[in-house]
Amino acid sequence: MNLQTQKINSANATAKGTLEKALLEEKLDKLSKDAAKNLKVDGFRKGKVPAGVIKARYGEKLQEDAEREALQELLDAALKDLGAEPSQLIGDPRITEYNKHDNGIDVEVKIGLAPEITLQESLTYVPGFELPSVSEEEINTRLMELAKAKAPLAPAPEGKALENGDFAKIDFEGFLGEEAFEGGKAEDYMLQIGSKSFIPGFEDQLIGMKAGEKRDIQVKFPENYGSEKLAGQEATFKIALKEIQVKAPQEPSDEFAKSVLPEEPEANLNLLKEKIKEQIATEKKVELYNSELKTKLVDNLVEALAFDLPELVVEQEIDLVFRNTLSSLSKEEIEALRNDQEAVKAKREEHRESATRSVKVTFIVDALAKKEGIAVQDNELIQTIYYESMAMGQDPKAMLEYYKNNNLLPAVRMAMLEDKLLTHLLDQKIKG
């Protein structure tokens, strides 16, 4: 095998060796005999096919398998020589030389190893911070918003003009030119003005109408509207406003608190205000975490922790980022790059710094998460994808299959792990 290994640093190594002809022939013979036991060939009983016939028919594939096995043995020997466990191997080794000759195949391989990260006490990396306070004014404002949202609907005073926030009971019918279109008609439809639940311009043109009034309005369906027949079309809607309803004023009270907190046997206004205060405090904490502290924490970790990165992983990340950016380029830019390899290399190199940081953060998060006992379970991963797909109006099962088929689940899991870890560390800082 003539194995030679070189450890460049703690995360990178090379291995050189020869896949000797005798070893390759030995493996080819064994693979041929194994195949002869299982393959069915016309003119021979199963299990009785001569190895020579197998080699003649499947020689190229068997040779590839023999070389693959021999290469794996060389790699295993290289790891042992380097004092590394197979579990430390990161990514697929890159073959940089594969020279076939009469006596075998000369091979050189680049190897990436899991980096060695020395972690201090986790909270030493967390920036100092104070949680925002919650004022009485904020609590009262939220309380009044809640009271307004839960207020019952009541008929508006006679003669009131429709305005934003009001509820309009309408009959409507839509037309393309003189022809009514399917799905464009409803009676006694309750529409909150300003809810933006109808196509743009529809609700705005109802403002100022009074109960009993009729009006024709003109709107244009969005270009990306779900119905191809209606997408981008100008339409007329005939509207009849039958009734205006408004939210009846409701003063917060103990009784109101009981209706909002039915699960609390001792619910009262003070308890409701405490719950509101907790909710606002949580919202402010999440906003502070996401807008400022998580970024600072990651910056601290990247600056404080120095370790070698496997070059193969960094190069793969650069390739990934580079390919993703190509989709945003114009046809002219793509064509220019296609004819200029130096420009391609320069464009790719622009992403080295960000890709290197991304890889470093991934290894840090993985190491810290193991130290802190943080993990993302399969049910959490699936639940997140389901919620996101429903929020986008997509089929959750189809979205999950898309992520699986495009090997995107590991990236989603890592993003969730990073967020979960950073939140955990910041919460631990609060506890002291």
Curated annotation (Swiss-Prot):
<keyword id="KW-0131">Cell cycle</keyword>
<comment type="similarity">
    <text>Belongs to the FKBP-type PPIase family. Tig subfamily.</text>
</comment>
<dbReference type="GO" id="GO:0015031">
    <property type="term" value="P:protein transport"/>
</dbReference>
<dbReference type="Pfam" id="PF00254">
    <property type="entry name" value="FKBP_C"/>
</dbReference>
<keyword id="KW-0132">Cell division</keyword>
<dbReference type="Pfam" id="PF05698">
    <property type="entry name" value="Trigger_C"/>
</dbReference>
<keyword id="KW-0963">Cytoplasm</keyword>
<dbReference type="GO" id="GO:0006457">
    <property type="term" value="P:protein folding"/>
</dbReference>
<dbReference type="InterPro" id="IPR037041">
    <property type="entry name" value="Trigger_fac_C_sf"/>
</dbReference>
<keyword id="KW-0143">Chaperone</keyword>
<dbReference type="InterPro" id="IPR001179">
    <property type="entry name" value="PPIase_FKBP_dom"/>
</dbReference>
<dbReference type="GO" id="GO:0051301">
    <property type="term" value="P:cell division"/>
</dbReference>
<protein>
    <recommendedName>
        <fullName>Trigger factor</fullName>
        <ecNumber>5.2.1.8</ecNumber>
    </recommendedName>
</protein>
<feature type="domain" description="PPIase FKBP-type">
    <location>
        <begin position="165"/>
        <end position="250"/>
    </location>
</feature>
<comment type="function">
    <text>Involved in protein export. Acts as a chaperone by maintaining the newly synthesized protein in an open conformation. Functions as a peptidyl-prolyl cis-trans isomerase.</text>
</comment>
<dbReference type="InterPro" id="IPR005215">
    <property type="entry name" value="Trig_fac"/>
</dbReference>
<dbReference type="InterPro" id="IPR008881">
    <property type="entry name" value="Trigger_fac_ribosome-bd_bac"/>
</dbReference>
<dbReference type="InterPro" id="IPR027304">
    <property type="entry name" value="Trigger_fact/SurA_dom_sf"/>
</dbReference>
<keyword id="KW-0413">Isomerase</keyword>
<dbReference type="InterPro" id="IPR008880">
    <property type="entry name" value="Trigger_fac_C"/>
</dbReference>
<dbReference type="GO" id="GO:0005737">
    <property type="term" value="C:cytoplasm"/>
</dbReference>
<dbReference type="InterPro" id="IPR036611">
    <property type="entry name" value="Trigger_fac_ribosome-bd_sf"/>
</dbReference>
<dbReference type="Pfam" id="PF05697">
    <property type="entry name" value="Trigger_N"/>
</dbReference>
<keyword id="KW-0697">Rotamase</keyword>
<dbReference type="InterPro" id="IPR046357">
    <property type="entry name" value="PPIase_dom_sf"/>
</dbReference>
<dbReference type="GO" id="GO:0003755">
    <property type="term" value="F:peptidyl-prolyl cis-trans isomerase activity"/>
</dbReference>
